[in-house]
From Swiss-Prot:
Binding locations of Mg(2+) 2: 95, 99
Keywords associated with the record: Cell membrane, Competence, Magnesium, Membrane, Metal-binding, Prenyltransferase, Transferase
Name this polypeptide is given: Tryptophan prenyltransferase ComQ
Family, per entry: Belongs to the FPP/GGPP synthase family.
Subcellular location: Cell membrane
Length: 315
């Protein structure tokens, strides 16, 4: 992770940065476990969990914000990004255990008590790593703040207490929005030593967008646990029973309808029910709210535009 400084021929300096190296982040995570976990069996299990990890989007969020706010210490942001991904991995494991989801993952094939202890070790190790990145104590306190907010959102989710669209959105802001906000805020704080309210605001909306994408994905996979528990924004829409397709889908997800026999039938019912259109509307509203909030970011225009492109990639 480094910077290239070039002249664009008009007397202006153009700053280019090499993208975050996900392979290096994964190796750094394994190094951290190897150096800090003494129990060999636990070490082997944690490293195997890390090897399964394929996405490093939270590390990217931290890195993009660090670079946008003129951070210059590549080793510091690499360590922070690795610590954040350890935290996210622990959160994924806890989430799978609590939801009884993602059964193909290696941690879901272990005794739940072993998997829970391993996830706790990962979470504790992540805090140790993040706390070691900088002398700023607030780096760790911000991590705890957003982790606690996300856990409260997860509590609402597990308790099945959200029943209206607005309650679901608030739950998503806490559960998913807090986890998206964490790396963005930490990246800025590591670069500047300051908390940025605008970054928190627009990151919450990014969290909503990500969760809606997960809900959309789950519609095509009946064994996806959130649909078995009937606790998603999509299911909240379907239970209004606006049409026969909605009723058919409710029965299908409850495994009481054998009329939907293949993916094409399922896609047809989803279109007819209106749930896909509904999720797209909610997602587009969140994207627009993100863009409006992002406009308030006080940053050099070149850096701001590059950050916007990076954050919107894949949305």
């Amino acid at each position: 992770m480094s910077h290239l400084v070039k002249w664009n021929g008009r007397g202006e300096v153009v700053i280019e940065q090499i993208c975050l190296d996900s392979v290096r982040i994964k190796e750094k995570m394994k190094e951290i476990v190897d150096e800090n976990i003494l129990n060999e069996d636990l070490k082997v299990k944690l490293i195997s969990f890390i090897k399964e990890k394929k996405q490093f989007s939270f590390a990217e969020l931290a890195y993009y914000h660090y670079i946008a706010f003129d951070g210059k210490n590549d080793k510091a942001i690499e360590l922070l990004a690795s610590g954040i991904e350890l935290l996210i991995l622990s959160a994924d494991i806890f989430d799978d255990i609590e939801d009884k989801d993602n059964l193909q993952a290696s941690w879901m094939k272990l005794d739940p008590s072993i998997a829970t202890n391993a996830a706790t070790a990962l979470y504790t190790l992540s805090l140790q790593v993040i706390g070691s990145v900088s002398n700023h104590p607030k780096l760790l306190s911000l991590t705890l703040q957003y982790s606690l907010q996300s856990l409260q959102g997860q509590h609402v989710d597990l308790n099945l207490t959200a029943s209206s669209e607005s309650e679901y959105i608030e739950m998503i802001k806490l559960k998913s929005g807090s986890l998206v906000t964490l790396p963005s805020i930490l990246g800025v704080y590591l670069a500047t030593g300051e908390y940025n309210e605008t970054v928190e605001e627009y990151s919450r909306y990014l969290g909503i967008v990500e969760q809606i994408a997960n809900d959309h994905y789950g519609l095509y996979y009946p064994n996806y646990n959130d649909f078995k528990t009937r606790h998603t924004l999509a299911f909240n829409y379907l239970k209004n029973k606006f049409n026969q397709s909605s009723i058919d889908l409710l029965n299908f997800y409850a495994q009481e309808n054998h009329m939907i026999n293949n993916l094409e039938d399922l896609k047809g019912k989803l279109r007819e029910s209106g749930v896909i259109q509904y999720l797209n509307v909610i997602k587009n509203l969140a994207v627009e709210n993100f863009k409006e909030s992002f406009k308030k970011l006080r940053l050099d225009e070149q850096r701001k535009n590059k950050l916007l492109i990076q954050l919107l990639r894949g949305i």
